[in-house]
């Protein structure tokens, strides 16, 4: 992980003395190989509430793991206690040390979510006060935010859709982009980890699902 990145190790595994160690198995393109399907079903997605990340007992509200490897964190806020996603963003910037292994860029969790019942924002790179969060919302009346949800919270799509096993594994396998922008000298190359916005993700997943169900057409 230190030599490459968390996303690279999750996707490609690593080798020890020429022995390949796979860290995750992703949905096979074809259902004709039952062994690949068995491997895919063996993936373990877990959620840890109040996950401690240092010796002082500090914790993050939620830690999502894939086969024991951290892939996402989330800070949850409730307006009933006079807090919202902005307080979660402030918490990430001021109280989450970007040098900590869980929060370190490339080394720790792939994405960090600031969540309240109305909005979701996310970032892939914690840089203390310089951290930039982007909306991960559906949109509301052609504007920002999320539409009303008669069956629950406006942000319930995050755990009811995005974090569901098949979708979450698809995102980790195919939708997170590690970009390197060459610089001179190479030691100063700029790197970023791109996590899709909600509408980008929804559009591609819908197209992929339709193609799998109906074929590519003629």
Write out the residue ranges for each language-model feature.
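ATP-dependent helicase/translocase motor core
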Residues: 1-218
């Amino acid at each position: 992980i230190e030599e490459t990145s968390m996303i690279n190790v999750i996707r490609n595994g690593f080798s020890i003395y020429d022995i390949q160690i796979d860290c995750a198995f992703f949905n096979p393109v074809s259902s004709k190989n039952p062994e690949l399907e068995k491997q895919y079903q063996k993936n373990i997605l877990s959620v840890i509430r109040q996950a401690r990340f240092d010796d002082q007992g500090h914790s993050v509200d939620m830690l999502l793991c894939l086969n024991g490897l951290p892939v996402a964190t989330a800070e949850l806020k409730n307006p009933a206690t006079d807090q919202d996603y902005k307080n979660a963003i402030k918490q990430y910037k001021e109280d989450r040390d970007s040098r900590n292994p869980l929060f370190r860029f490339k080394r720790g969790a792939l994405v960090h979510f600031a969540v309240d019942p109305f909005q979701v924002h996310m970032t892939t790179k914690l840089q203390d006060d310089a951290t930039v969060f982007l909306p991960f919302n559906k949109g509301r009346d052609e504007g920002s935010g999320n539409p009303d949800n008669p069956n629950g919270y406006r942000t319930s799509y995050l755990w009811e859709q995005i974090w569901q096993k098949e979708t979450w594994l698809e995102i980790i396998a195919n939708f997170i982009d590690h970009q390197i922008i060459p610089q001179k000298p190479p030691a100063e190359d700029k790197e970023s980890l791109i996590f899709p916005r909600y509408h980008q993700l929804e559009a591609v997943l819908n197209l992929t699902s339709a193609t799998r169900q109906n074929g590519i057409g003629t």
